[in-house]
Amino acid sequence: MSDTVKQFSVRVLKDAPLMEFLAERLKDYSRTQLKSLLSHRQLWLNGELMLTRHDHPLKAGDRVDIRSSKTMRRNQKLEHSQLKVVFEDEHIMVVYKNEGFLTVGTDREKLQTVYHVLNQYMKTFGQDKRIFVVHRLDRETSGLLVFAKSKEVQEALQSNWETLMKERSYTAIVKGQLPEQQGVIKAYLWEDKQLRMHASETDNGGQYAETKYSVMGTKGPYSMVQLWLKTGRKNQIRVHLQSVGCPIVGDKKYGGSASPIKRVCLHAGLLTFKHPMTGQMMHFEWPIPSSFNKLVRVK
């Protein structure tokens, strides 16, 4: 196989995990080359889902697209220990950030942020180029973010956020067990003078917030929970889980105990949204951090 991969598609004939399917159908590719396709984000499922896991389950009838490495070279120019580009076109960027890395600057820190790194990257294509913030993740949270490449796209995303954003999913490890296996946490959130958020069951002038949850598994004192935002308030998931007596492990600001894996156990691993300019449905997933499995392992 040459170093330049042209775009083509392969139909799935029987259920199989991704790497097993690739090894069987792409016999001209070495194992290393197949792994390279995965690591360089060149594999897509049915034209919508970027494949990031070697064991992603495929179903008979699915279509796996292998996209040209030439289209990925622009992405590969950005190399940063705390940040990876997942998708990029002329309008948007989708990136993954590690925990402990700021989305935007603060009074104390301006440079070590996703925003600054992406802005510097954009300037390599022209001094007039810049990036535009669409939404944020807390410093302590790892996960996926979408940025705009123009004011027009930023406004299109933000003004139509509830219409365009179809799903945002998080995974958390909490201390304790939620009252039900599935449910919705509802509360009004307000901020005190120390910039700490609080939850109230009654309307006290705060912002109404809803978080849907599903318990994925439990082990000892810990539970792994998948969460979906119905609203997007500051620290919403963190304060909601604290309000029901199940604070996120490592989240000392909101009642969490010390983390055995040395991090706040919250990960924004799924984004599904309609592209603001093309109308295409975009779906991105980033695997749950392997360290989470040390506390609760879910098959």
Regions found by a protein language model. Name each.
Residues S2-K299:
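RNA pseudouridine synthases
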